[in-house]
């Protein structure tokens, strides 16, 4: 026999994940819209090769590595969201150019409600990284400066 207390317990158990998902979605600052909203996001660390996220242009797809996302979030909460938006920049611009995707993501976040939180986290994240240079990204400090400049330009 099911008692009212047991029924309420089951209801809470079933509704809790849904309420958590809705609360998480409400906190998200940037959401893909238009054609970008149809881009699949797949959680697959094999596809990311150990990176936070990567994108493919044909077909347009974003891959996330939940393990690396969690590591970035633990160290620099919010910076992981910049990586996510950055990958959509590649798809929106149909380019492999990392600087262009950085700038696109910075402009998008600068216009998003409370996007400055994610921008500040990403800028701090890159400023704290070792000064190793990459031909695709430049140094982490150059990347931080690029993100900041693009965000400031978008805010004008």
What feature does the model see in each segment?
Residues 13-23:
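Bacterial N-terminal signal peptides
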Residues 3-15:
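Bacterial N-terminal signal peptides that target proteins for export
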Residues 29, 95-98:
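Conserved strand-to-helix beginnings and helix N-cap segments that scaffold or border functional pockets
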Residues 78:
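Positively charged, aromatic-enriched nucleic acid-contacting surfaces
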Residues 82-94, 101-102:
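Active-site recognition of the HExxH zinc-binding catalytic motif
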Residues 71-74, 91-95:
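Extracytoplasmic/secreted cell-surface and envelope-processing proteins
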Residues 29-75, 103-156:
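C-terminal capping/extension segments of zinc metalloprotease domains
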């Amino acid at each position: 026999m099911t008692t009212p207390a047991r029924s309420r317990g089951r209801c809470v158990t079933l509704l809790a994940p849904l309420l958590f998902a809705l609360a998480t979605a409400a906190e998200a600052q940037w959401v893909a819209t238009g054609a970008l909203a149809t881009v699949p996001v797949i959680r697959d660390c094999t596809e990311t090769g150990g990176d936070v996220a990567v994108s493919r242009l044909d077909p347009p797809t974003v891959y996330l590595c939940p393990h690396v996302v969690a590591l970035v979030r633990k160290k620099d909460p919010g910076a992981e969201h910049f990586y996510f938006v950055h990958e959509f920049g590649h798809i929106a611009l149909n380019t492999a150019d990392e600087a262009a995707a950085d700038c696109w993501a910075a402009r998008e976040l600068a216009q998003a409600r409370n996007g400055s939180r994610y921008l500040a986290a990403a800028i701090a994240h890159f400023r704290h990284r070792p000064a190793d240079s990459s031909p695709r990204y430049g140094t982490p400090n150059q990347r931080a400066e690029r993100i900041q400049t693009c965000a400031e330009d978008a805010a004008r």
